[in-house]
């Protein structure tokens, strides 16, 4: 089994967040930028060798963070991202092609998911590390789903068998590269890496995630993430003193 590399697509602007003078991955969360939390959660794992972060060409915020060299004693490499998530991930994979081994695997993670727990990452690597088509964290859909008809309910949708995809999403480096390249060549627009592998005749494995692994999309999510991180820190302190 090869090494694991973190890939963080972070070239987006995140306009839905509203307010502030910076993209949501650079907003402060408990005194630190959101992307800093995301990197630390991945690079703190002993099996993760380093990270590649894909940034906008004119990103004015990254250099001020001082993350270009190391996080948790591991290298952080920077590449220029693209207009879409898939373009940024492909750029990061191309960079890894020059420094990684053919059997290495990648953990593609949203820059705005700062609350990934060590237990989740362990579970993803343990259950999905050997999967030929990769694996992803996901949670079963719990709420009743409605399909809209204008501003009214058009139908109730069965949630049986439905899961909500999260990140990280874990794949063999070569498998994901081939899937993304093929999707691009065919003009298929994919919204996450698992969809590219699905389209490329694969079946990524679902690994149960946690509700706390939330994605920062709106201002209220920052407050919720702060509560999750505070609770995680308290739990760790209790374990250390037990």
From Swiss-Prot:
Query: What SUPFAM superfamilies does UniProt report for this protein, alphabetically?
Result: Nucleotide-diphospho-sugar transferases
| Alphabetical list of InterPro entries matching this protein | IspD, IspD/TarI, IspD/TarI_cytidylyltransf_bact, ISPD_synthase_CS, Nucleotide-diphossugar_trans
Could you provide one GO biological process annotation from this protein's UniProt record? isopentenyl diphosphate biosynthetic process, methylerythritol 4-phosphate pathway
Q: Where is this site: Positions MEP for the nucleophilic attack?
A: 159, 215
Give the intrachain disulfide bonds: none
Q: Where is this site: Transition state stabilizer?
A: 16, 24
Q: Does the keyword Cell division apply?
A: no
Q: What is its EC number?
A: 2.7.7.60
Which sequence ranges are marked TM in the entry?
none
Q: Which domain of life is it from?
A: Bacteria
Catalyses which reaction(s): 2-C-methyl-D-erythritol 4-phosphate + CTP + H(+) = 4-CDP-2-C-methyl-D-erythritol + diphosphate
Tell me the GO molecular function terms.
2-C-methyl-D-erythritol 4-phosphate cytidylyltransferase activity
> Which EC class heads this enzyme's classification?
transferase
Q: Quick one: which pathway?
A: Isoprenoid biosynthesis; isopentenyl diphosphate biosynthesis via DXP pathway; isopentenyl diphosphate from 1-deoxy-D-xylulose 5-phosphate: step 2/6
Q: Which UniProt keywords apply?
A: Isoprene biosynthesis, Nucleotidyltransferase, Transferase
The secretion signal range is none
PANTHER family with a match to the protein in the record: 2-C-METHYL-D-ERYTHRITOL 4-PHOSPHATE CYTIDYLYLTRANSFERASE, CHLOROPLASTIC (PTHR32125:SF4)
Function, please?
A: Catalyzes the formation of 4-diphosphocytidyl-2-C-methyl-D-erythritol from CTP and 2-C-methyl-D-erythritol 4-phosphate (MEP).
Protein family (similarity comment): Belongs to the IspD/TarI cytidylyltransferase family. IspD subfamily.
Protein name per UniProt: 2-C-methyl-D-erythritol 4-phosphate cytidylyltransferase
